């Protein structure tokens, strides 16, 4: 299982929010590209990038910082990017810039036809980010909670051909409160594609618990505030995940390797 460092971008800086609220922001670095190199040097095998301004604006807002990150790490490890991606032209531009996987969130929920077209146009490169509060999907940078059930939508999008589902529990994101294991496991069991857990991954206990569920289809865990504030040592976490992964027989999670 992969432990995936998150680099959330706001106004060109590497930040973390609490529960997705733009005002609850902590700036961790004014040089996101250097931060990307740091995680690469620590042994990261994938980076999770989010254009926070873009998620709220509905269009890319941190493209320069994203290009700098891609330039800094080259093709050494894959990247996955979400936030404000609402049309095929933006997807094509990011892929041309060197991003490996595109994460579609709000647009997948509001205009599923767009997601279907994206999967057809860029097979193997499209993921869906489902961000939930109390089991219901949220959109527009988490500012609006819909009536859509997470599992129902994920199964629909799986049929479209998405590569993986990134599941975030909004109530736990940036709170260092632990992963919503029950909801993450329920989602993974309902799908045949990999699930990447996010929101609240903050300790080695979280990593261990998720690794135990890897055979159910949980292929990765995104972590942010914990590795920036030091409550979770990234390198130790990935080493633990590697050790535990050799002891399990996971469902097809080869997308992440």
Swiss-Prot record:
It comes from the Bacteria. The gene is hisA. Pathway: Amino-acid biosynthesis; L-histidine biosynthesis; L-histidine from 5-phospho-alpha-D-ribose 1-diphosphate: step 4/9. It is an enzyme of class 5 (isomerase). Transmembrane segments: none annotated. Pfam families: His_biosynth (PF00977). InterPro entries: Aldolase_TIM, His_biosynth, HisA_bact_arch, Isoase_HisA-like, Isoase_HisA-like_bact, RibuloseP-bd_barrel. This is 1-(5-phosphoribosyl)-5-[(5-phosphoribosylamino)methylideneamino] imidazole-4-carboxamide isomerase. GO terms for cellular component: cytoplasm. It comes from Nitrosospira multiformis (strain ATCC 25196 / NCIMB 11849 / C 71). PANTHER family: 1-(5-PHOSPHORIBOSYL)-5-[(5-PHOSPHORIBOSYLAMINO)METHYLIDENEAMINO] IMIDAZOLE-4-CARBOXAMIDE ISOMERASE. GO terms for biological process: L-histidine biosynthetic process; L-tryptophan biosynthetic process. The active site is at 8 (proton acceptor), 131 (proton donor). Its EC number is 5.3.1.16. It catalyses: 1-(5-phospho-beta-D-ribosyl)-5-[(5-phospho-beta-D-ribosylamino)methylideneamino]imidazole-4-carboxamide = 5-[(5-phospho-1-deoxy-D-ribulos-1-ylimino)methylamino]-1-(5-phospho-beta-D-ribosyl)imidazole-4-carboxamide. It is found in: Cytoplasm. One of its GO terms (molecular function) is 1-(5-phosphoribosyl)-5-[(5-phosphoribosylamino)methylideneamino]imidazole-4-carboxamide isomerase activity. Keywords: Amino-acid biosynthesis, Cytoplasm, Histidine biosynthesis, Isomerase. Belongs to the HisA/HisF family.
